[in-house]
Structures are given as C-alpha cells and as structure tokens.
Amino acid sequence: MRDKIRNARRIVVKVGSALVTNNGAGLDKAAMGDWARQIATLRGAGKQVVLVSSGAIAAGMQRLGWQKRPHEMHKLQAAAAVGQMGLVKAYEDAFSRHNLHTAQILLTHDDLADRKRYLNARSTLTTLLELGVVPIINENDTIVTDEIKFGDNDTLGALVANLIEAHALVILTDQQGLYTADPRRDPNATLVCEGRAEDRSYEAMAGGAGTGISRGGMITKIRAAQRAARSGAHTCIASGNEVDALIRLTQAEPLGTLLYATSSPLQARKQWLADHLQLAGDLILDDGAVVALRSGRSLLPVGVVEVGGEFERGAAVACRSAGGDEIARGLVNYSSSECRRIARKSSTQIEKLLGYIDEPELVHRDNMVLR
C-alpha cells in the first residue's frame, strides 16, 4: 500500500502551525528550511509539490508579543496579516537556497465553491507546477472567518488536492499519526498504520480539537482524508519532526498513518461530474465532434454548431448531437456568449476573436464524462 505514496506524481503537503512556529515560539526557520530541502529533493525526482502551510496567525501572535490566542476576530485577522509577511519571506528564502521559485496563493472557501473562480485557481496552480514553481497556499485569514474559527487548513489541503487532482495529500503534524485511542491517556493505544479513508470508525479514534496554537486536532485530519479520498487522493498523516519524513514517505517507508482512496483522481472526478452537475446549457455538435468525444478527446470550438442557454465559464453543459442525444456533459471553459463567438472556429482563432485565450478546448476531456 505504501507504493501509493511512492508512485504519487502530484503531492499536496500540509504543514501545521505547531510545527511551523515551534509550538508558538516563533517561526522555526530551521524546520522550514529542512522541508524546503526535502521538497527540492522530491522536485528533483520528478514530483510536483504544492505546500499548504498554516502559521500566519501564530507567527503574528509571536511578532506582536501575544502569549494567548485572542478571541476577538479583528485581532486574529490582524495577527494573520502581520504573520503572513514573515511566513512567506521565510519560505522564499528557504526555497531560494535550492534554486526554486515560490508563489504565494491565499484562498477562501468561496474561491473553491464558485465554479469560475475554481477553474481560474486550477489553471493558475497547474501553470505554476508546469513552470517548476512551488505554490505556497494558506487560507486568506485576513478577510475570512471560517478558517480562524474552525482551524480548517487540513480541509483546505484536501480541497487543494481535489483542485489540482493530486495523487496524495501528506499532512505533517506534531503527532506520529492516528492512534486507536489517545496515547496520552491510554497506554494500550496503538498506531493505525493504514486503512481505507472511508472507514468511519477512525473518527471515533481521533478524539477532539488541537492545542491553542494548532486548532485542528486529529479529527479534522481524518475528515480531510475522507474528503481527499472522494477526489481519489491518498492521505498520509505523519510527524513533521521525523528526520526526512517527506523523502522517506515517497520511498514507501511506513511512517505515520496511510488512509488510502479506492479510486484514482480521474475516476473520482468523472464520478462527481456524472452525479452532481446541474446542467446550465447545451452545445450542439457536428458529426466529427461526436466521433471525437466518443474516442476520448476534448471538445474543440470547431466542432460546435450551436449554443443553447446562458451560462458562465465553469458551468456544466450537455454536449449533444444534432439529433438532440446527450453525448457527454462537462465543465465549459468559456461563457455562452463567448462560445457563440468562437463556435465553428479553429482554436488558433480564439485569442483574435475574444482578445484572450483561457484554454484551446471548450470542454477538456478530464472535465467531461460520456453518457
């Protein structure tokens, strides 16, 4: 089973606040530098890595001299704004020592709930990975409240795994992994080495919330693993204090707890497309496009003869034959008005007709499911 992590080409690594800030003592730049070194090693092995890092609020608290986490929302958001500056600078310095560029991306749950913004974020992250850049993601704590209230960066890591169709999510924490009971209270507690992410019994084992610095606790990590599994990603929960933890995990060493998915990212995505999309419009295809889609290819503008309905980029549309039969459905890369302007045209003409080009396809095959 550990080969699932070794074979993962695209990995999301989530690092918790307690690790980043050395349990609230300030940014642990030595540890951050070591994770950068390990991620550089993974990049050298041909893997793409996205880093989801907590720590902005905790770093801000330390800079402001606050010993206890405040309850007032405006103070938490102020701490996040102060701490984010130092957090990103420390990572930039660490990765630059390995000749790696980094990119800061601050997300909110709304960015991933809105289909248009979801596709924009997906395109940006995919481009950064193709350029060899290491994206560093955090929740935009300064303007949102959900993450601050609930300590939700574990869930953010799972959502990012879904966004980029990652093969694995690695959650580094200050614990060894999931235990059958709280090892601080039960001497008979044992480490869960691996199991299906969908196994609901793990929630009972996970217990309650985290510390004053780390807000998540094991329960949010288990739920993040369940969410990641629904998009086909395997999750490993392991100690970030282990020497070379990331490197050893990608060498199939049995560290921490592996919670594996039962379907691949693409299979899971196709199932989601088939089950959950509400159609906003129709694309009527010529015979050549029908054959192309049934052969597993993407839908190009040249194959569309008519556009039905009004919709925005990222909406779900049905791809139909001239006779009205639904051939496929998927997420469209352009709005209905834009689709009408580029229908029956070559992809090379998109930029000339629209003034920009998002994608050469109207619907990419990975965002499409045949009927």
From Swiss-Prot:
Keywords, comma-separated and alphabetical: Amino-acid biosynthesis, ATP-binding, Cytoplasm, Kinase, Nucleotide-binding, Proline biosynthesis, Transferase
Gene Ontology cellular-component terms listed: cytosol
Domain PUA span(s) in chain numbering: 280-357
Family matches, as InterPro entries: AceGlu_kinase-like_sf, Asp/Glu/Uridylate_kinase, G5K_ProB, Glu/AcGlu_kinase, Glu_5kinase, Glu_5kinase/COase_Synthase, Glutamate_5-kinase_CS, PUA
Sites where the protein binds ATP: K14, T173, D174
Binding site for substrate: S54, D141, N153
GO biological process per UniProt: L-proline biosynthetic process
EC number: 2.7.2.11
Protein's UniProt keywords contain Kinase: yes
Function: Catalyzes the transfer of a phosphate group to glutamate to form L-glutamate 5-phosphate.
Localization terms from the record: Cytoplasm
Alphabetical list of PANTHER family matching this protein: GLUTAMATE 5-KINASE, ISOPENTENYL PHOSPHATE KINASE
Source organism superkingdom: Bacteria
Protein name, as recorded: Glutamate 5-kinase
Pathway given in the UniProt record: Amino-acid biosynthesis; L-proline biosynthesis; L-glutamate 5-semialdehyde from L-glutamate: step 1/2
Chemical reaction(s) catalysed: L-glutamate + ATP = L-glutamyl 5-phosphate + ADP
Protein family (similarity comment): Belongs to the glutamate 5-kinase family.
Gene3D superfamilies per the UniProt record, alphabetical: Acetylglutamate kinase-like, PUA domain
GO molecular function ontology, one term from the record: glutamate 5-kinase activity
